[in-house]
Amino acid sequence: MNRGAAAEALAASYLAARGLTIVQRNYRCRGGEIDLIARDREVLVFVEVRLRRNREFGTAAESITAAKRRRLRLAARHYLARLGREPPCRFDAVLLDALETKNIEWLRGVEGI
């Protein structure tokens, strides 16, 4: 398992332990991708997982660029169109500095995505 897949698996376990239900992993469409899609009660949650081993090129949060946010929004719209309805939604980010649960930061309702 590569580091990205390991980070996504760790994030999924972390969110599930906090009551979210993982609906889908690695949702892809032309031009977009979402790492995790989950349910938090009635809210559909689109989750971006970011792993940074060091901060030489910025933090995990800083690595969510404008282009990445556009791809997330595109994939979310595609997913909702396939779903055929639009439940309440939000975008979250799970940030990891290492592949350990003690180094996880969960940002709910990230603005700008």
Predicted regions, residues:
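Acidic-basic catalytic patches of nuclease active cores, encompassing PD-(D/E)XK
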Residues: 1-25
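Conserved catalytic cores of phosphodiester-cleaving nucleases, focusing on short active-site segments
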Residues: 15, 34-55, 59-60, 64, ...
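Hydrophobic "anchor" residues on beta-strands that sit immediately upstream
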Residues: 21, 44, 88
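Short acidic/glycine-enriched loop/turn segments that link adjacent beta-strands
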Residues: 30-32, 100
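Gly/Pro/Ser/Thr-rich low-complexity, intrinsically disordered segments predominantly at protein N-termini
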Residues: 61, 81-82
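Aromatic- and charge-enriched substrate-recognition/interaction segments
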Residues: 67
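Domain-level recognition of nuclease-like catalytic cores that cleave nucleotide substrates
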Residues: 82-113
